[in-house]
């Protein structure tokens, strides 16, 4: 992987990631394909809305169908018919989500499979092996996602364990051609975040992710962490904010220098009738759309908006038709890719803050301040 920084506008960055399987323009949003599919979307539709990289889930694919089935096809790209880059998470966040069903030790995490109840030990070495089998273009280290809320002592202990696992992940990754990203932990404590980043840089990674956010904290807490951490992150490496988020969350993180994002929000919300427009979120289940012949968003040129009315989408949703979920998802992911494209253009042209003012103005919201 090669990362090229093309332009800056304040702290915001316009860049490019280059892989043998293709290039990714940054800032970039990665649709989430948990089980080897971005829900309700074909790979061709993903390409059509402008996605250049997607995310796969190591934990879930390891459990079902298992790497042995995927490797019968080649790797995850072949299995799911996606020819562009794939980033896979390490499984750390999913293990964190199991809560009382897992036991963390120095070696790794023991847990009961949610599929068949068998006991599984997931270690940094095992995570690297699985991600290698998946053929990931970007591999994430195995870490412990610090719980929220956490005391400073709890956050420190968790962060230090993650640093030791990071070093083991690097050794296990070996000479794999895939990029390997470290993950900064440390909870809501700036000094611990700095220590985590320092330790990761000492080990040396191809990119650096910020983990342990979007786990229940408020926006002010998240921005406090980002405002402290972003100026310290290596400028020559890509920066990835994991699991974030809503359009306004992405805009604020881009203003602070983040390059990469992933989140299930656009696809999950699409299946639940929440649609993104330039003015904010539209609830298609609202009764006022029953006879509305207009598109979701007059300014949107996605397949859904070019061909279907709000009334039709409300009808499909009311009847629980699969097509409704598909059309809604096409629109929401198109909105996200358009958002990223506009952010890239604004940064490249040195007019990001003017674009941000327009973004919030259309939503009748004040522009948040950035240090």
Swiss-Prot record:
Cellular-component GO terms for this entry: cytosol
Keyword line: Glycosyltransferase, Metal-binding, Queuosine biosynthesis, Transferase, tRNA processing, Zinc
The EC number(s) this enzyme carries: 2.4.2.29
Residues of the active site: 89 (proton acceptor), 262 (nucleophile)
Cofactor(s) listed in the protein's UniProt record: Zn(2+)
Chain residue ranges for the region called RNA binding: 243-249, 267-271
Catalytic activity of the protein: 7-aminomethyl-7-carbaguanine + guanosine(34) in tRNA = 7-aminomethyl-7-carbaguanosine(34) in tRNA + guanine
Pfam families registered for this protein in UniProt: TGT (PF01702)
Pathway where it operates: tRNA modification; tRNA-queuosine biosynthesis
Binding annotation for substrate: 89-93, 143, 185, 212
UniProt xrefs under InterPro entries: ArchSynthase1/Queuine_TRR, TGT, TGT-like_sf, tRNA_ribo_trans-like
Quaternary context: Homodimer. Within each dimer, one monomer is responsible for RNA recognition and catalysis, while the other monomer binds to the replacement base PreQ1.
Protein family membership: Belongs to the queuine tRNA-ribosyltransferase family.
Name the record gives this protein: Queuine tRNA-ribosyltransferase
UniProt organism field: Thioalkalivibrio sulfidiphilus (strain HL-EbGR7)
Lineage: Bacteria, Pseudomonadati, Pseudomonadota, Gammaproteobacteria, Chromatiales
Gene encoding the protein: tgt
